[in-house]
């Protein structure tokens, strides 16, 4: 399969730079996986699409202010993007500089350069940085960090992004990008879903900066996925198995929830799904056999991204590309702050040939 098979024309004007005034007021394009039928509506229509006993699985990661600015003590400006927090004093990060710092280099971080840190080691493209400060990494980031808005949101981060670029149920700090499908859920909608009898469970996947990296190979089978840490605890496993047993659906909110659940299913030895606490490099593209997820809530993704490949594996390639074409024609808003899709699984997707 070629990466270019997943390309589509997207006018710049359809990229959302700000969220809707109300989280749940965005548009919703529903795609029936088996038939490819499309329905246009608003996000609150989700309430009518879910049945009592269906299980919604959310990702409760919380975005950290992961972008830092400063300079090397020896001179030269730097930009640091945290990939993950290693412990209370150390981070693994991408560093942008005219000349990469060497191990032992002193860094002065923050708009006032008040935070002292040392680049201690290099791991491939990533740099290990240790803060010389009595505060924890998280406290330092909250103090001097900027929200790491995606590269296609072409504006500086604003104070409002600290809440708008978080889900209302975010709990565990560690992501450098929001699980954006969850941004559309507000408390009134969650309350209505609970009142209807829709069950809810929470996985954790700390989204890494790699989620924005373009696929740099021509053939997608050659692509190596970035690694992200995921947690699928026992209570989620129990909820999934119970939903399946009573004939209800497991609905993943976002591709990160999909990747968490399907990683746990891949690693399971004795059951459909078992608890999972580990890094995952799962790469889902057409031909992938889904084991857990029956329906998906997701945003519109970048052309040629691993995420549109994941959706194509779920709904079928042709159905997915047709839906994206319709979304462009109907002027849906794209990417992190954009509109959403509700997609049901297409069991025939696994047999579909792509790009032939």
From Swiss-Prot:
Highest taxon above the source species? Bacteria
Pfam families per the UniProt record, alphabetical: Queuosine_synth (PF02547)
Primary location recorded for the protein, binned into one broad class: cytoplasm
SUPFAM superfamilies xrefs: QueA-like
Cell location:
Cytoplasm
Instruction: From the UniProt record, give the pathway where this protein acts.
Output: tRNA modification; tRNA-queuosine biosynthesis
Report activity regulation.
Inhibited by S-adenosylhomocysteine, adenosylornithine and products.
Which InterPro entries does the annotation name?
QueA (IPR003699), QueA_dom1 (IPR042118), QueA_dom2 (IPR042119), QueA_sf (IPR036100)
Reactions catalysed, semicolon-separated, are:
7-aminomethyl-7-carbaguanosine(34) in tRNA + S-adenosyl-L-methionine = epoxyqueuosine(34) in tRNA + adenine + L-methionine + 2 H(+)
Cited function = Transfers and isomerizes the ribose moiety from AdoMet to the 7-aminomethyl group of 7-deazaguanine (preQ1-tRNA) to give epoxyqueuosine (oQ-tRNA).
How is the subunit organization of this protein annotated in UniProt?
Answer: Monomer.
Q: Which family does it belong to?
A: Belongs to the QueA family.
Protein's name according to its UniProt entry: S-adenosylmethionine:tRNA ribosyltransferase-isomerase
User: What does the record give as the organism's lineage?
Assistant: Bacteria, Pseudomonadati, Pseudomonadota, Gammaproteobacteria, Enterobacterales
Name of the gene encoding the protein in the UniProt record: queA
